């Protein structure tokens, strides 16, 4: 299923050492085999992944920026958050199309004025004292605008959460589409 494929990509991307990983299919395959042998990734997950897709991401301009940040200890992945926002500015989770984001009514309860939004940020890194936010997507969408429409609100919540938590500005927000093989700036 699409969700299993997405999870398989996310689990592998979470483990890759961006600071040393070469953007080559063989390097991705070797890393995955090591994770499988160590019991932290499964062969079933790996069967859902195209190593060439991940190698292409690693070699992309955004992937190279992530690698540079990782080399300085400034890359963070799979970061959970909870964000308080006014109820008037929330949207239903059905309109978010993402399982990684739930409104308080589904997750932790709400008040008359504020609600809590929780999620997991795929990756962000510091660059020149500011934050670059990115989210991996495996959806089989074929137009950049479809990604912006489907995930814009979700990533706006992620941006707000990061700025609130870190006190730093998010200077760029990106989606990396494994289907399109490129980064999409929001």
Identify the role of each PLM range.
Residues 1-186:
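Structural signature of nuclease core domains in nucleic-acid processing machines
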